[in-house]
């Protein structure tokens, strides 16, 4: 019998408020036991979106081809390839497909009826994997009752029930509600196909659609995010870290995406443009290639960046980045800089009017005023703040879930396979302890905005021992030296060592994961498929799913991105070809072509009981059994 002063008694008393009778407890235990024996929900893994909104949206809508697989399985030869393609496109883009159907004058009542019935067949098939309660919660609220009724039509029902359901369909069409129901069913199908989305970092930069991606993610039903270095950069910028802000500007200048700053986030660059034009020399009319890129805007941003980075590096000797203090090593007489190789390298420009050779990292008064204004612009953008708050609420440095360990970049390592130590505000940390520190310091930066934590946001973006970066980034060399041999960026030993299954096992063990099973899932480093690289490494223990969403990387990677599907039947890696356009999908059913690589095939279907959710459910059942015992023994009274 439980003592009334016991903590467990207090917990059971609270639990009894939710389940006040034995019957209520019985019902919940039966429900939870049933859930344990359902197939696990399908998990969808994506990484390194880099602002490619249309490609991201299509893969989100087609669920990496899983929607088409279900349509093929359900209808087989009953429908032609064109009919199945039309149905899939309707599921992907219901509003756009309906608008096109009207333009083509095919949106007749009979067309609506056929499409509604086909969508219902797909939705019924998918809903059989879940409890009715979960399906009801997934149905758009406005039509929950009617769609729930339609989903539970069975071929063996009596004629009265069949006529009842036929009458519902007829009423939908008579009241011109067909479009709303088609859109609602299409959304429901996509929610039932994918139970949960894992986004393994790097939403921002390169492509111009990061703001749209964030808006869409904020509407998604279930997801988590593992922060990438580009995400952490924007998080630092939104918190007001000056070097992060200038780096964001540099990245968007490089890819021609200032619209995301000015139009999406309302950040004015007018003062920066004016400052650059009056301070720096214009590009020479005969300039080509590398030097043609050194516009006044580029030169202004570069100098601001290297001054601000230099200040951070000098504040933090523990970052061990003194080799990046190159602005002060410029020989203005010869227009050269001496790098670590001890040799002078010719600079593509000698236009440094605001750099004081005696104090190279000090901002001029005009530069300081400009930086202060940019900090104000970034920290006062409401739209950006909402996006960053969402990144914090759904994101983390890493996630251990369902036998998988997810993080964007690396766990810093030494050449001998041990975890590399990093001085973290006076304490040396390594492995999981270090990633936990990085997670906390990132949250502190947003919460407290103190200089130390903000400077760490910059380090997490660029540092050699940053788990989100893991390489020696050579921004200065890439900005000023027209010699690709100077641009080589050494990588953390992690990226080579994790080709070894034993190293992957050691990393999994460090994070409390079971040995000999599961996977490490990374993004960050594009898989050069065209050069023979493979995303499945270390005998399947490491999966690298950055296949190059960014269109600029397609020639290097040979594909347009990898995604991962983990279902009750095992894992599948999807290699996607480039996305053509939404218009091509609508007019020609031009879906993304994807190759599937099956691995970790389940000998028996994986059920909810085999997942982390299953562990939680069994704990709930144990608590409910204790509550039931308390009712039976009289320790707690029922409240009918």
Task: Outline where the language-model segments fall.
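Feature recognizes metal-dependent phosphohydrolase scaffolds
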Residues: 1-640
């Amino acid at each position: 019998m439980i003592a009334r002063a016991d903590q467990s008694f207090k917990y059971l008393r609270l639990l009894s408020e939710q389940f006040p009778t034995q019957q209520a407890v019985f019902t919940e235990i039966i429900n939870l036991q049933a859930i344990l024996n359902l197939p696990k929900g399908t998990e969808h893994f994506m990484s390194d979106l880099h602002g490619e909104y249309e490609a991201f949206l299509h893969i989100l809508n087609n669920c990496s081809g899983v929607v088409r697989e279900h349509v093929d399985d359900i209808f087989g030869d009953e429908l032609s390839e064109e009919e199945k393609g039309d149905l899939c496109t309707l599921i992907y883009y219901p509003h756009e497909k309906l608008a096109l159907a009207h333009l083509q004058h095919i949106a007749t009542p009979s067309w609506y009826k056929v499409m509604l019935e086909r969508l219902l067949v797909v939705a019924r098939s998918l809903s059989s994997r879940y409890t009715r309660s979960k399906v009801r919660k997934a149905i758009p609220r406005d039509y929950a009752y009617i769609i729930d009724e339609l989903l539970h039509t069975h071929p063996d029902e009596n004629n009265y029930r069949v006529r009842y359901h036929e009458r519902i369909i007829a009423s939908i069409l008579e009241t011109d509600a067909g479009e709303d129901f088609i859109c609602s069913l299409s959304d429901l199908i996509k929610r039932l196909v994918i139970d949960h989305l894992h986004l393994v970092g790097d939403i921002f930069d390169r492509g111009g659609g990061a703001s749209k991606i964030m808006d869409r993610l904020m509407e998604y039903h279930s997801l988590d995010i593992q922060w990438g270095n580009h995400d952490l950069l924007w998080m630092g910028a939104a918190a007001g870290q000056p070097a992060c802000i200038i780096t964001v500007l540099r990245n968007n200048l490089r890819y021609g995406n200032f619209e995301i700053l000015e139009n999406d986030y309302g950040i004015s660059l007018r003062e920066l443009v004016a400052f650059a034009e009056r301070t720096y020399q214009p590009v020479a009319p005969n300039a080509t290639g590398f030097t043609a890129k050194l516009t006044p805007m580029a030169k202004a941003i570069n100098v601001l960046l290297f001054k601000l980075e230099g200040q951070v590096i000098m504040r933090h000797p523990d970052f061990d980045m003194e080799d990046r203090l190159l602005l002060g090593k410029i020989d203005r007489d010869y227009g050269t800089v001496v790098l670590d190789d001890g040799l002078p390298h010719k600079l593509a420009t000698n236009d440094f009017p605001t750099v004081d050779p005696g104090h190279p990292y000090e901002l001029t008064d005009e530069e300081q005023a400009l930086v202060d204004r940019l900090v104000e612009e970034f920290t006062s953008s409401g739209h950006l703040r909402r996006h960053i708050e969402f990144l914090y609420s759904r994101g983390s440095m890493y996630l251990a879930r369902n036998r998988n360990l997810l993080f964007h970049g690396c766990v810093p390592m030494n050449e001998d396979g041990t975890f590399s130590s990093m001085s973290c505000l006076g304490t040396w940390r390594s492995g999981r302890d270090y990633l936990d520190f990085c997670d906390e310091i990132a949250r502190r930066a947003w919460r407290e905005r103190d200089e130390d934590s903000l400077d760490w946001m910059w380090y997490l973006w660029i540092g050699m021992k940053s788990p989100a970066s893991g390489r020696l980034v050579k921004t200065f060399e890439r900005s000023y030296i027209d010699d690709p041999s100077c641009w080589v960026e050494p990588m953390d030993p992690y990226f080579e060592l994790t080709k070894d299954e034993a190293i992957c096992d050691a990393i999994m063990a460090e994070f409390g994961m079971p040995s000999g099973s599961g996977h490490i899932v990374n993004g960050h480093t594009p898989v050069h498929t065209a050069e023979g690289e493979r995303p499945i490494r270390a005998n399947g223990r490491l999966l690298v799913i950055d296949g190059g969403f960014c269109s600029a990387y397609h020639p290097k990677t040979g594909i347009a991105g990898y995604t991962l599907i983990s279902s009750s039947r095992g894992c599948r890696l999807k290699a996607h070809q480039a996305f053509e356009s939404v218009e091509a999908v609508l007019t020609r059913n031009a879906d993304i072509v994807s190759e599937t690589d099956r691995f970790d095939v389940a000998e028996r279907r994986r059920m909810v009981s085999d997942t982390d959710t299953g562990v939680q459910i069994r704990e709930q059942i144990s608590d409910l059994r204790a509550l039931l015992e308390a009712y039976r023994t009289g320790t707690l009274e029922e409240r009918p």
